[in-house]
Each structure stands twice: as C-alpha cells, then as structure tokens.
Amino acid sequence: MPPRIAVFTKNKVNPGYEAARVGAERAAERLAASVTHYVPERPDNVEEQIELVNRALGERPDAVLFVPVHETAVNDAIREFDAAGIPLFNMIARTTAGKRICFVGSDDRALGFNIACHLFQTICGRGEIAILEGTPASPTSRDRLAGFHDALARFPDIKVRMSLRGEYLRTVARQAYTEAADRPHAVDAVLCANDHMALWVLDALDALGAEKLPVIVGVNAVPEAIAAIETGRMLATAHFDTMAMSAIATEAAVRFLNGESVPSEIMLPVQIVDAENYARWNCPFDARPCPTWHEVVAR
C-alpha cells in the first residue's frame, strides 16, 4: 500500500503555503505516495489546527508533515503523534514539541539580513523605512526581524519610522499600513517579512493615492511578487522556497518509512530575486523546478 502522509499547513490565503502543498503533491506523485492536506479555514487558527490533528489521528496516516500555526499553543496536539507512534516531519517553521524526525527549512535570520542589506544598498545606505513584521507566534517572523535589525546595525543612516505587525496576512498588512498615523506613503522604503504583506502594502499605497512608491522588498518569491518585480513595483524578494521544503520533507518521510536513515535537519539556500534574475521564477509554482534529494542532502 502506498505511504499515506498527512500534510499540515497554516492557511489557505498565503501563497507560500499553496506552494508547500504543491511541493508535497509533486513529490508524493513521483514517489508513489499519497498526501492528505489539513488546513484551517480560519488562517493560522490554533483551535482548528488542534481539531485537524485529532481528525488525522483518527485516519492513521503513516507519517505527518507539520507546520505549526503557533510556536507553542499546539504542542500538546503535536505530542499526540508521538503517543500514536506516527513519525513527525517538520518544515518551514520549527516545532517546539514532539519527537521530530527531520526539519526542512532555511536560515531565516540570514535571509532577513540579506534582503534588508539588498534594500539598504539600493537606497544608498540612508533614508527612512517602514518594517512589516510577521506574527510573533512564528519563529520565522522573529528570526527575520532579528536579521533586519542585524542589517540596520550595519547601516546607521537608515532610520525606522515605524514597525508594524502584518501577521504575515495580506488583509492585516493592508489595514495596518493604511491606518498608520505618520504618512506611511512618505517613507523611502518598506521592508516586509513576506511577499503577501508587501503586495498589500502596494494596494494600500495605491488606495492612499501615493504619487511615488517607496522601494519595497518581500520574502517568498511568489508569482505575484515576481510580476511586481517585472513591472518595477517591487525591488526584490528572497526565494524562501516552501515548495522545495515540502517536497524534500515528503521525500524524507517516504525514505524513512522505507527504512532509510534521513538527516535530522536539511537547510535550503535562499537566493535574492530582483530585476536581474527574476525570469527564472516568472512562472506558476507547479512549473518551477524542485531541487532533488541528492542535491540538497549532499551539499
């Protein structure tokens, strides 16, 4: 019987998690496995993810791929996989409970540092910026913000006018940016912890009637952000490759179920995407290449 893998992602609105689901499906098809997706209807909702864990436990998958909606609030539910003897594979954002077999992700602090430095160099190392943070409940948000501040320490003439919580969600980011009291359209640049928020900053600025856009960067290299780079509305994005993370985590699960040893951690490199190289990413998620197991494990 083909391995059955339960895949938990945080929401249905962030394109990064759409990419993760695509990655799991592509890998499962190639490896003769099957995946079932468990996604809260309300984005990042703790109670719903706990309910989904209980549903999955009743369906007895062979392995679980898991992205926690909160760093600690779903820990008791995660431990239920251990109690049921179901191996846990973690991707994108680290779990803080459970006997994780393997984590697949990237260095979010380095990613934040690199995309911030790219932005600061573009505005010649001086000016006023706004920061759009993710959700405090996510370690990726905390680490990216730390990377942003590492970069700020290197550029003393960059001043942060405001740092807003966009919760990694497009509607929240737009509202936060629109309601900011001190003329957000007048900053020189906007540093966003993901593309989903960066795109709503663009929408908010359009609604405010901004005559000139600030320089904007994001993270994830989602297709809509690549289109914005192509038209000059965004400067750059960091390719935090959730599709590859999920595909590699799926393969790790299948290999483990087949009796192979797998690394406890697999870290994927991150590349800055801008007007010089965006063409490689200028396609839908399912048309993008995924790195192979041997390419990432042998690095």
What are these regions (language model features)?
Residues 57-82, 148, 160-162, 166-228:
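Hydrophobic alpha-helical
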Residues 57, 119-124, 181, 249, ...:
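Short, hydrophobic alpha-helical segments
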Residues 1, 136-139, 151-152, 244-299:
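Hinge/cleft segment of the Venus flytrap/periplasmic-binding protein
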Residues 8-22, 37-48, 70, 93, ...:
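Hinge/beta->alpha junction and helix N-cap segments in small-molecule ligand-binding domains
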Residues 188-189, 202-243, 247-251, 255-267, ...:
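Exported/periplasmic ABC-transporter solute-binding proteins
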Residues 71-110, 118-121, 128, 220-235:
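Flexible loop/hinge segments that line or gate small-molecule binding clefts
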Residues 3-4, 33, 123-129, 214:
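Nucleotide donor/acceptor-binding cores
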